[in-house]
UniProtKB/Swiss-Prot annotation:
Phylogenetic placement of the source organism: Bacteria, Pseudomonadati, Pseudomonadota, Gammaproteobacteria, Enterobacterales
Origin superkingdom: Bacteria
A GO CC annotation given for this chain: Bam protein complex
The protein, known as: Outer membrane protein assembly factor BamA
Domain (POTRA): residue spans on this chain: 24-91, 92-172, 175-263, 266-344, 347-421
């Protein structure tokens, strides 16, 4: 068969020769030049097979399909008789990719981006993708202020059609701002305008180390802030005509010139509310707090629109349209605002779904919902659902999405997406102490037991001085309305032994059970009952009480004490996140007192409040205030039982002081005086190392929580640092050292006297085994007998 026509197809810079014929039958297909791309893969990308009737269009489409694979450099097709021959030149295979010169971006980040583009080892080399990579990388460097950066890619092709890519990156220096000039400002001085900019052309006196670098994106943000400033002052026709950025000859400095037109100030003479607003007309009108002859304020009007949208979203109107149409009186410089509102459809919630809860049962999440299925959509209730879920310790990263249903009129589905946190801890400890000997402890806790939302905690301690065990369980929805039941059973056999002066063996067992009632989303009331059986045995009488009367605690020699207590508390909680809160308040007020049938008669009250105040919009810098105050006393002439005293341990401690060494001490007389604190040869008295606690307490913490330098954003969820000031003490309000002149050498624990304080830094890590807290403190107020401990480590929630 004669060759009638030869046609050439150019696609990009490739050519194809084909002898044309309208339609003919192919009996053979041959391929030349294939090395890494198989014949079968080519056949999958062409539009004909052996025996097919083909046309010129079939060949054109086949060539286009093959080029779209990105694996061929040239494709030439020759038609000879009933044979089609593909003469193909493959693109080289990428063998190796190396980088040099990159300091800002790691090799791994660059390789990841190249892989996303399709440029990786083992892939065919595509020059177009290289161009895209260079363009985008230069754009990135420009966005971070490296405007003169350069990227070059050198290619080395081997004989086996493989290619090595060597990417050389020149990261230019940051460009310093030489001068910022504002032209057209008649009503506000340059200094006032530049105070709105984050870009600066001069250093602040208080921060002489700061740099004045130019970033194009920051300039756009600054100009937007400038525009908003004028619009909020009434300059309705304020305009930024243009900006001019001129690089100086050395290209390391830049001059910025901004041309503005301020215009005249406009007042609002009136406003009108238009639209089918049904029964909401008056409520919406009340949001528009604009007075006649008030200067135009864009920020205020934007806030009004947001309030109206929020109001309607709580009534079921998901997407109301609010358009403000101004009528301008140029002569009088006045504006009439027309609020044109279309509330559109009203939606009901069809179904609430949860995504991400692999362990947690659906009912556990659903009972936290404030929005009810089948009722009108209410954005406020949906957001309260997020806050309720955030208060569960075992959940994080909670978001919500809505999906409008097209198959159900006015219906919308709500989906909460969440991430489950580790819910259980199992700890074992082994230690040795001079007095306690070998010590073993173990604990287990589960905040989401079998996905039920219930909490279970148990712990044991065993050493020469103590045998301790307790178990507690909390059912957060004991009654469907959100009533919690918390029950704890405990046993403690402890020998108080201080420097061989005395031993007290105290055996305690009992239980506590509380019911917690939900008042609203942020407040809860607890009321409960407790029973404690105390067995006290005094083995030594060589000690004095704090008022100096010898053996005044003789009743401890053999004593069985049963206490029945009424427990009550009020909790207010608006914290954003349980661990690492960023805003809000948590206040806990509790009390307990004995009831008839108890061997003791006493009361105790505790006030615990912490407030997190974000100092900037991103909530990276947070000011924390925390105060714990307590008071307790006997209801008769007796003292508060010593085992009910407040102690400086755990969250009560002042950092920098050893735990349980702050506050009243026991005072002794003994021949072995060197073992006591405060010993001097002129006195036969000394005090114990550890505190016996007191009936009054005030501990306050002031902290500035700051981001940790050089820590990536994703790690900031698990790490937090702060600078702190701790102050306070433990007191005994019945302490009176004037009763005995020999006690003058010891600190006075009268209320509000003898304050202890420290300053320092702290680091908290939310580790896989729970929160770990490290602190380093320096005491600024102390007494000579204080036991100091600069570096401290704690396990548990701190702030």
């Amino acid at each position: 068969m004669l060759i009638k026509t030869i046609f050439i197809i150019f696609l990009m810079f490739f050519s194809v020769n084909v002898f044309s014929k309208n339609v003919w039958i192919i009996e053979n297909i041959q391929f030349k030049g294939l090395k890494y791309f198989s014949k079968d893969e080519v056949l999958k990308n062409i539009f004909f097979n052996i025996g097919s009737n083909i046309s010129e269009n079939d060949i054109k489409h086949s060539i286009k399909s093959l080029f779209q694979t990105g694996k061929f450099e040239t494709i030439k097709i020759v038609h000879s008789g009933k044979t089609i021959i593909f003469e193909i030149k493959e693109r080289p295979i990428i063998s190796n990719i190396t980088f040099s010169g990159n300091k800002i971006i790691k090799d791994s980040i660059l390789k990841k981006y190249l892989t996303e583009l399709g440029i990786k080892e083992g892939n065919f080399f595509n020059p177009f993708l290289n161009t895209v990579f260079v363009k985008n990388l230069k754009e990135f460097y420009s966005n971070v202020g490296r405007y003169n950066s350069d990227i070059k890619i050198f290619k080395k092709i081997s004989s086996n059609n493989k290619i090595d890519l060597q990417i050389f990156i020149h990261e230019s220096n940051l460009v310093e701002i030489n001068h910022i000039k504002i032209i057209g400002n008649n009503h506000f001085p340059r200094d006032k305008i530049l105070s709105l900019f984050k870009l600066k052309d001069c250093k602040s006196w208080w921060n002489f180390l700061e740099k004045r670098f130019y970033y194009s994106q920051q300039l756009e943000e600054d100009l937007k802030n400038l525009s908003n400033f004028y619009l909020n002052q009434g300059y309705y026709y304020f305009n930024i005509h243009r900006k001019k950025v001129r690089f100086l000859k050395d290209k390391n400095k830049v001059n910025i010139t901004v041309y503005i037109s301020e215009g005249k100030k406009y007042k609002i003479s009136n406003f009108f509310l238009n639209g089918n607003l049904l029964q909401y007309y008056q409520s919406i009108k009340n949001f528009i707090n604009i007075h006649n002859n008030e200067f135009y304020n864009k920020e205020k009007i934007t806030l009004i629109v947001k309030k109206i949208q929020r109001f309607l979203s709580e009534k079921g109107y998901i997407d109301p349209k609010i358009i403000i149409y101004p009528q301008i009186n140029f002569k009088e410089k006045k504006i009439i605002l027309n609020f044109n509102i279309d509330i559109q459809k009203r939606y009901f919630v069809n179904k609430i779904n949860f995504r991400g809860n692999e362990l947690t049962q659906d009912i556990v999440l659903r009972r936290e919902m404030k929005q009810i299925e089948g009722e009108w959509f209410n954005l406020k209730l949906i957001e309260l659902g997020i806050k309720s879920l955030e208060k569960l310790k075992f959940l994080s990263d909670i978001t919500v999405q809505k999906e409008i249903l097209f198959n159900k009129e006015n219906g919308v589905d709500i989906t909460y997406t969440l991430k489950e946190q580790p819910t259980g801890t199992l700890n074992f400890g082994l230690g040795y102490g001079r007095d306690s000997g070998l010590s073993f402890n173990a604990s287990i806790s589960q905040d989401n037991l079998f996905g039920s939302g219930n909490s279970l905690k148990a712990s044991i301690i065993k050493n020469d001085n103590q045998k301790y065990a307790d178990i507690s369980i909390m059912h957060p929805y004991f009654i469907d309305d959100g009533t919690n039941l918390d029950t704890r059973i405990f046993y403690n056999d402890f020998k108080y032994n201080i420097n061989s002066f005395y031993n007290i063996v105290k055996t305690t067992s009992g239980f506590e059970s509380d019911l917690s009632f939900l008042i609203n989303a942020f407040n809860r009331v607890n009321i409960g009952f407790g029973y404690t059986h105390n067995g006290l045995l005094n083995k030594e009488e060589k000690f004095f009480s704090k008022n100096g009367n010898k053996s005044s605690d003789k009743f401890l020699k053999t004593s069985l004490v049963d206490d029945f207590t009424l427990n009550y508390s009020l909790t207010h909680d608006t914290l954003k996140y349980f661990y690492f809160p960023i805003s809000g308040n948590q206040t806990y007020i509790s009390g307990k007192n004995t009831i008839p049938g108890s061997d003791n008669k006493f009361y105790k009250f505790l006030f615990d409040s912490e407030q997190y105040i974000p100092l900037e919009e991103e909530k990276k810098f947070i000011f924390l205030t925390h105060i714990r105050a307590g008071i307790g006393n006997s209801l008769n002439k007796e003292k508060l039982p010593f085992y009910e005293n407040f102690h400086a341990i755990d969250s009560n401690n002042i950092r920098g002081f050893r735990a349980n060494t702050i506050g009243p001490k026991k005072i002794y007389i003994n021949s072995n005086l060197e073992e006591c604190l405060g010993y001097n040869k002129k006195s036969i008295f000394c005090e114990s190392v550890d505190s016996i606690g007191g009936n009054a307490m005030i501990i306050s913490n002031l902290e500035l929580i700051t981001p940790i330098p050089l820590i990536k954003t994703e790690y900031s969820k698990f790490l937090r640092s702060s600078f702190f000031l701790d102050a306070g003490n433990i007191w005994d309000t019945r302490w009176d050292k004037e009763q005995n002149i020999h006690f003058s050498q010891f600190p006075d624990y009268t209320i509000l006297n003898n304050i202890q304080a420290s300053i320092g830094i702290s680091l908290q890590w939310f580790s896989p085994i729970g929160p770990l807290v490290f602190s380093y403190a320096y005491p600024i107020y102390k007494n000579k007998n204080n036991q100091l401990e600069a570096f401290q480590f704690n396990f548990g929630k701190n702030w």
